């Protein structure tokens, strides 16, 4: 059973408390924002922005940030809770791409298409590294090991430059070669 997009949003809000009301999650988003400053990106895309917390923190820090999510319920939530954000269904070109816990929901073909559209110079990437009994419910269709992700991004013309351990212990930062 796959969660509907409304159930997915409800789980993020209630079960995981991925909101601006959760000081720990806000602090994590701030940590990610601080980490990304060294790249001096002209623009940032929060790809699969979910509840928009990363986007809102980046906006408050002065980044030129765009929030993107394919789910209408997530976009509507972001527009209501973060009215100053630019929120879109389709991705936009950006210098830095936040790709946090989204790729496991995508096929390799969708990943390739996203990279063609966004054309990021830097990618802060994190994707669930292990298979679980909950993958099907959460729509996890593409679980890869760290080395498999690194190989895939290498094939797309990126090199691994850091393992920042933020926002997750398995996060990776890639740079266009």
Provide a role label for each language-model segment.
Residues 1-94, 109-115, 142-148, 152, ...:
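Conserved N-terminal segment of class I S-adenosyl-L-methionine
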Residues 98:
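A conserved beta-strand element that flanks and buttresses the S-adenosyl-L-methionine
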Residues 120-133:
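Conserved beta-strand signature within the Rossmann-like core of class I S-adenosyl-L-methionine
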Residues 130-142:
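C-terminal alpha-helical "lid/dimerization" subdomain adjacent to the S-adenosyl-L-methionine
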Residues 156-158:
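A structural motif corresponding to the C-terminal end of an alpha-helix
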């Amino acid at each position: 059973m796959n969660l509907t997009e409304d159930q997915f949003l409800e789980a993020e809000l209630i079960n995981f408390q991925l909101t601006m009301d959760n000081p720990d999650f806000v602090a994590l988003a701030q940590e990610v924002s601080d980490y990304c400053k060294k790249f001096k990106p002209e623009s940032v895309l929060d790809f699969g922005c979910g509840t928009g917390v990363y986007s809102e923190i980046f906006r408050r820090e002065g980044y030129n940030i765009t929030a993107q999510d394919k789910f209408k319920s997530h976009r509507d939530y972001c527009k209501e809770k973060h009215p100053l954000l630019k929120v879109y269904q389709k991705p936009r070109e950006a210098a830095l791409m936040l790709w946090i816990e989204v790729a496991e929901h995508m096929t390799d073909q969708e990943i390739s298409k996203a990279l063609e559209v966004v054309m990021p110079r830097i990618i802060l990437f994190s994707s669930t590294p292990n298979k679980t009994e909950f993958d099907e419910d959460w729509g996890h269709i593409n679980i890869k090991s760290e080395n498999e992700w690194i190989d895939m991004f290498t094939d797309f013309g990126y090199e691994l430059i850091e393992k920042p351990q933020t926002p997750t212990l398995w996060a990776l930062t890639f740079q266009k070669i």
